[in-house]
A protein has these predicted regions:
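Transmembrane helix-loop-helix hairpins at membrane boundaries of multipass inner-membrane proteins
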Residues: 2-3, 18-101, 105-115, 191-196, ...
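C-terminal ends of transmembrane helices
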Residues: 16-23, 97-107, 149-157, 226-237, ...
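Alpha-helical multi-pass transmembrane bundles of energy-transducing inner-membrane proteins
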Residues: 24-26, 115-119, 123-208, 290
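Juxtamembrane/interfacial segments at transmembrane-helix boundaries in multi-pass membrane proteins
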Residues: 50-76, 174-231, 235, 257-281
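Membrane-interface helix caps and helix-loop-helix hairpins in membrane proteins
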Residues: 106, 128-136, 267-271
Length: 299
């Protein structure tokens, strides 16, 4: 088994352990053991990665593994990491570990809460190790689905409103993202959804890039709280439980930025360069709204 698959296997084992656990002590034991294992694995991966780079390994992605899932659509379980994804895995593991203790006394439905929390964590880790477009999208959605319940059930204040608003906006972003990913795949003429191979082909027509890039960037940008699609974020943060807010701000929103870089800008660099003026306008809007806001959580 590839070492990177540990980051999906551990949450799966945690889900099984939580499902079978009886009593609060057993539930906490499963969470602490699993979160500790993820943290240790991320630290080990960081040292292994640095060791490979120090030894002169210049491969774009390290610790690669590919397993074909569905041949007709060329969907594979393809994993690999570079410096950015290694850093994000380490950050995610730290937040999952600390978030576990932040939820130590959470009531009610402690078992169900940790089941959804673990499922969200699995989606995050799976997304950061994936290099296949379909697999990335699958883990991306796995990470988003639990947010509705984690906020709507265990949140506070206007939790139902915040959860519904978050869900509707992220669903809209996911629809744009799915269209963009399919457009990239069919437009590239590739026989695989592996983003490294699509990037090497580099044959997505510029006219198509100008269509698929905005859709993909917008799809990820909604989760990354890209202006003006950020209005769900303040409500979500204010209503979410502490640990969920930690994971939300520290990791989940980073999925959006990582996806913009890893898929949109990496696979369609010409469109990214041509449409860079949009980023300048959005930056100006962000500075203006930040100056006008009277509550920091609304920035």
């Amino acid at each position: 088994m590839n070492f990177l698959s540990i980051f999906v296997l551990i949450p799966l084992l945690m889900l099984a352990g939580l499902w079978a656990a009886r009593g609060i002590k057993a539930i906490r034991g499963v969470m602490v053991t699993g979160a500790s294992a993820l943290l240790i694995a991320s630290v080990v991966l960081t040292f292994l990665y640095l060791g490979e780079r120090s030894a002169g390994n210049t491969a774009e992605m390290l610790f690669r593994a590919d397993t074909l899932w569905y041949a007709p659509l060329h969907i594979s379980y393809s994993v690999g990491v570079d410096g950015i994804s290694v850093a994000m895995l380490l950050l995610s593991a730290v937040i999952v570990f600390t978030g576990t203790f932040a939820s130590w006394r959470l009531q009610p439905l402690t078992k169900e809460y940790f089941l959804w929390f673990t499922l969200l964590s699995m989606g995050v880790f799976g997304f950061f190790i994936s290099v296949d477009l379909f697999t990335m999208f699958m883990f991306y959605e796995i990470a988003l689905i639990p947010m509705y319940l984690l906020i709507g059930v265990w949140g506070s204040g206007r939790k139902e409103y915040a959860a519904m608003k978050l869900t509707l906006m992220l669903m809209g972003g996911s629809a744009f993202l799915l269209i963009g990913i399919l457009g990239i795949y069919f437009g590239s003429g590739a026989t695989t959804m592996n983003l490294l191979e699509i990037a090497q082909l580099h044959n997505i027509p510029f006219a198509q890039q100008c269509i698929w890039f905005p859709l993909t960037f917008l799809g990820f940008g909604v989760l990354g709280a890209l202006f003006p699609f950020h209005t769900w974020s303040p409500d979500g943060h204010a209503s979410a439980p502490t640990a969920v807010s930690m994971l939300h701000a520290g990791v989940l929103m980073k999925l959006g930025g990582y996806g913009c870089f890893r898929i949109a800008m990496y696979l369609m660099p010409e469109a990214a360069n041509e449409l860079s003026w949009i980023f300048l306008i959005l930056t100006g809007c962000l500075l203006y709204t930040s100056d006008a806001a009277d509550d920091l959580i609304g920035v």
